[in-house]
Amino acid sequence: MKKKQASPRVIIIVGANCGIGYYMVKYLLEHGDYISVLDIELDNLKKLKENYPDRLITIIADAAKDEDIKNGVSETIKQFGKIDIAVHNACLCTFESESDSNYELYNKVMNINFFGALRLSKAILPKMRKQGFGRIIFTSSGVGVTGFGNISPYASSKGAIESLAKCLEIENQKYGISFHLFHPPLTNTASASKLPVPKEFMASPQKVGEGLARHIDSKKFVICHSFSQAMQMKLCYRHPLYMGKMMWKMTTRAKNHGGQ
């Protein structure tokens, strides 16, 4: 029997048409929450919308556009009356080295991954401060902590949101608002498909999405879907460069042996 929330929450998620975000939405709806999804594509959510017409809002929105996010937040509050939790899950991942990446690419990735998180925060913080509570979660990545080869635009953007979340947590704790980071493992999603890593070493997006949704109320600053992932992240935070170099060597070895 599924455990229902004592008081249904209103949760807005930017980037949830597929992968980890989709399974977060599905799990949260099944457990009684009200969900608003902002994404540039919404096709995969049609069935969920049919099953939960009164508890799921889907809004076409681009994480890189201020007005889209502002309008999505306003529409969510208009229909559901409040927002308890906001999640920035949209991301753009590229697999180029620094020498193959121009400023335009860095700006494009930062605009979605970092400034997208900031956009959501700026759109929703005035509302949360007024209501006196709320939590905002950014989906981060281990490479934002450790570094990694041929992925510096993406890794840099994730490193930036690590610092942003810490700063905004300090600034907003007096309002009853907390900031957190989701830290999923390497997951079998479209964005990770180009990595030369055997699929059997990647986590299931359903397992990760459901696990993160289950812990969405965690008081921990870093939220993981499982105990083993939490232990791995402890190592990454304690020995960042060592872990980054080790993972890069392992990935390079897998690529040289034809692991896809």
Go through each PLM region and give its residues.
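Residue(s) in the substrate-gating loop at a strand-loop-helix junction
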Residues: 141
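Conserved NAD(P)H cofactor-binding loop of Rossmann-fold oxidoreductase domains
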Residues: 89-94
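Conserved glycine-rich cofactor-binding loop
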Residues: 17-18
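Active-site helix of classical SDR
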Residues: 121, 157
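C-terminal helical subdomain
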Residues: 181, 197-233
